[in-house]
């Protein structure tokens, strides 16, 4: 454990208070023009504004100054795990999130379906975000075309939209390495990269990846839009200290997308079933309400604030923020002792990608001070009395506000 996590573990105590952590994925943004507003500031959010007026605000750097967090490191940081110490690839998170069991030596990989043009140039890294039904159809094609490579069993799984997972099953006594460069260049207008092993133990896996990419393009050659694959986030089986053991909290995850459910599962949270598709807002509220008495801590995830930012759709990201604002009163009706609203990273529509900008943080509790803030925005958060903090500081703050930490020292 990191020093802070180990210290908190020694101070944590069980109480009846409840903590609700709302993660608006990628919520931080940028104005489109010099004097413009961010997506958060543009959105009409009367309920978030009212909550901000009863709260303390601040900012979090999830990994470190200038470092752009992936979703995995961003969430680990929010949960109190040092993301530089506890490292996991997106492949394992997605695999575990959809219920795939990984064995020692296996390697899981997160894939994107992509659109390739002449000369294999990437036209769209997400293939137009195909429907889940189309995703399943493409996965079936790949399963039929690539059941194994050089004696290594290959399993392909659907995730959602453009996302899929591939698991390479290690032969007996021959563990596969996962230290490999990404195939996904994360930009358009260039060819997919060649996977390169970063250590000798990963050379076989890199060869498997490159062979899969080539065979997939052959298998999908008749597809007008979903005709290529991009890989990133290779991972073997990760192990983390138990969230419950560290914080004395019985914790539940309410999320729709497999990667986030996978991460919650890996740290020991119970993943609650959610009715509905995509962000399934009402289904999430229902899951929260029906399980409120059973848990001390709830992780409540909203995805589309991130997806719309990655699409560069400023107006739609504003709309998704406003949809959450309409939902917020139903969360507050449950009267959590502590509620936090935060992002796992920023995803400005202007950049169409994750960014290094700090994420705005709001904490309301019965024992917290109030800031003069009028709204939950990046600008108000930058002036907040919580200041600019490292991501793993969040959980101790929530625990303290819930009166779940004993005093340190005499």
From Swiss-Prot:
Pathway: Carbohydrate degradation; glycolysis; pyruvate from D-glyceraldehyde 3-phosphate: step 3/5
GO molecular function annotations of the record: metal ion binding; phosphoglycerate mutase activity
Reaction(s) this enzyme catalyzes, per UniProt: (2R)-2-phosphoglycerate = (2R)-3-phosphoglycerate
UniProt-listed GO biological process terms: glycolytic process
Keywords: Glycolysis, Isomerase
Isomerase among keywords: yes
Family of the protein in this entry: Belongs to the BPG-independent phosphoglycerate mutase family. A-PGAM subfamily.
Protein name as annotated: Probable 2,3-bisphosphoglycerate-independent phosphoglycerate mutase
Organism (species): Deinococcus radiodurans (strain ATCC 13939 / DSM 20539 / JCM 16871 / CCUG 27074 / LMG 4051 / NBRC 15346 / NCIMB 9279 / VKM B-1422 / R1)
Gene giving rise to this polypeptide: apgM
